[in-house]
Design a protein with these regions (language model features):
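Active-site segments of SGNH/GDSL-like serine hydrolases
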Residues: 60-67, 73, 95-128
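Conserved SGNH/GDSL esterase-like catalytic core that processes O-acyl groups on lipids
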Residues: 1-92, 114
Length: 128
């Protein structure tokens, strides 16, 4: 029986959501996070992940800070994380990791959002 969580990836999460406590009520927060938080409403995803004593860390976060804005036609600036906020939050994430862990790790780059399949069209006669 597995008793320890090793993958803290959460669908749809933004960088800032790694740093704030998640509500214990799944209807008021990220559903998956409220189910695995060690202390809902107090602990953070990043804190819970670092508390497991990881030996390797993959930081692949940030896509969702732009994805909703891009797929929504860039029509709602309120859902776009500003460059300043993104930088502050990502620096806080990396700083927390470097200050709390001796694990090896990789920080993945965010691909150009327009390179995802959502933004490609295929002509009706493309497949013979």
């Amino acid at each position: 029986v597995k008793t320890q969580l090793n993958n803290f990836g959460v669908p749809g999460i933004t960088v800032g959501e790694l740093l704030v406590p998640t509500s214990a009520n799944p209807s008021h927060s990220l559903y998956y996070t409220s189910r695995f938080a060690t202390n809902p409403g107090v602990s953070t995803i990043l804190g819970d992940a670092l508390a497991t004593g990881p030996t390797f860390i993959l930081v692949e976060i940030g896509n969702n800070d732009i994805l909703g804005y891009a797929t929504g036609g860039a029509s709602n600036p309120a859902i776009l994380t500003t460059t300043a906020d993104f930088t502050t939050r990502m620096n806080a994430v990396i700083g927390s990791i470097l200050g709390s862990s001796t694990a090896s790790g990789v920080v993945a780059n965010i691909p150009n959002v327009t390179s995802i399949p959502y933004f490609f069209t295929v002509p009706w006669n493309a497949i013979p």
